[in-house]
Each structure stands twice: as C-alpha cells, then as structure tokens.
C-alpha cells in the first residue's frame, strides 16, 4: 500500500495559499485516478483508492491532515501505524521555497530544511520517507517568508501551478511503483520549468508581486 499525504492548512481561508500546494497536488491525484470522496479519518480528510500501473493497480491512501501544517506528522503517523507501513511507503507532497516556481524534486530522507511540517512528520515516523517538493519560490528575504507562504497564488502563477499539479497526477503510476527518479523526470517533462535560484528571481521582481 502507498500512503500519499499532502501538507497544508485546513479550511477555505488557506485553500489557495502557496503553503497548500501539497493539498492541491493530492487533490489532483485523487481526481485523476477516480478516488471516492474523502472522509474524516486519521485526523485527516482521507480517501482510499488505487493508481493503475503497468504492473496492476496499487492500493493508495491519500491524506490531507486537518491538524494544521506544523502538526501534520500526527495524522501521517496514525495512518502509517494503522496500515503497518514502512517510511518507504509514504510520500509527502509539500511546498518548497528553495526551489524556483514550478520546479519539482523528489527526495528520500534528510533533514527538514526549516519546514515545520516535514519536521513534524519526521518526528512521528523517522526521516526516511519520500518527499515530493513543489517549488513555490522564495520572497528574497527571511522575514518575508511567513507572509509569502500564507498568501494566495497570484493569477499569473496559475499558468505554472495548474500544469504542475496535472503532471504530478498524470505521472503517478511511476510514483506508485516506487520509481521516484523517473517520476521526477516525467513530471518535469510534462510541466517544464526554468531552473533558477529562487532568491535571485525574487530580487528581480517589482515590489508587491
């Protein structure tokens, strides 16, 4: 079984925030692969279904923790324990300010790099889970990060957000088979984005963008 969790904050106030792109990604995966409506379970909105692969369907649980972003690990830990899963069975989708907008990277293990949601998951299940990092860009200065991640995507940004989410869903069979390297490559093939230093990109923007 595969457990796919998205990080985000619950409720309509936060729904379009950059911090909620993890929720957006798992919603698109659930929609693309015909998962049933989510229900309250494991301190989350949870939906169980399957992702079709060349080797057959892979049973998958999609989680949107309702604990608020920084406590997401409690939900992931409960579900993992219930299904007796290993960290390698868990994929967490989340926003990554240290990647340029639209960039996508898979990673297994490592530190939290200042992300409190990832730190929470690691505190519950250990660090060796799989991370799907969705680049949202950096505002350029540390003191601007909080406002940046808790602000909605601008309309212009949806030109890369929507293709990225669709690519994450369309390529999901590779994720379900555990081939994270090919999954990353296929997502970036379907939704290419320029590789750049997100802080330098921020410096080139007019104020207020």
From Swiss-Prot:
Alphabetic keyword roster: Cytoplasm, Hydrolase, RNA-binding, tRNA-binding
Gene: pth
Self-association state and partner proteins as the record states: Monomer.
Lineage per the UniProt record: Bacteria, Pseudomonadati, Pseudomonadota, Alphaproteobacteria, Caulobacterales
Function: Hydrolyzes ribosome-free peptidyl-tRNAs (with 1 or more amino acids incorporated), which drop off the ribosome during protein synthesis, or as a result of ribosome stalling.
Stored PROSITE patterns: PEPT_TRNA_HYDROL_1
Binding annotation for tRNA: 14, 68, 70, 116
Superkingdom of the source species: Bacteria
Active site per UniProt: 19
Cellular compartment(s): Cytoplasm
Record-given protein name: Peptidyl-tRNA hydrolase
A GO CC term assigned to this protein in UniProt: cytoplasm
A GO MF term: peptidyl-tRNA hydrolase activity
Main location: cytoplasm
CDD domains: PTH (cd00462)
Site (Stabilizes the basic form of H active site to accept a proton): 95
Top enzyme class: hydrolase
């Amino acid at each position: 079984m595969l457990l796919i969790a998205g990080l985000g904050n619950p409720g309509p106030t936060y729904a379009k925030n950059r911090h909620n792109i993890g929720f957006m990604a798992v919603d698109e995966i659930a929609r693309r692969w015909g998962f049933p409506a989510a229900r309250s379970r494991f301190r989350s909105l949870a939906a169980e279904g399957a992702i079709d692969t060349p080797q057959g369907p892979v049973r998958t649980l999609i989680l949107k923790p309702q604990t608020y972003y920084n406590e997401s690990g409690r939900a992931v830990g409960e579900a993992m324990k219930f299904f007796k899963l290993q960290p390698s069975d868990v994929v967490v989708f989340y926003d990554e300010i240290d990647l340029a907008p639209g960039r996508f990277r898979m990673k297994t293990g490592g530190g939290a790099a200042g992300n409190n949601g990832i730190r929470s998951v690691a505190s519950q299940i250990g660090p060796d889970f799989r991370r799907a990092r969705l680049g949202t860009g950096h505002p350029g200065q540390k003191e601007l990060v909080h406002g940046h991640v808790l602000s909605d995507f601008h309309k212009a940004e949806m030109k890369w957000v929507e293709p990225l989410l669709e690519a994450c869903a369309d390529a999901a069979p590779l994720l379900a088979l555990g081939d994270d390297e090919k999954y990353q490559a296929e997502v970036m093939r379907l939704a290419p984005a320029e590789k750049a230093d997100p802080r330098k990109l921020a410096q080139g923007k007019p104020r207020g963008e």
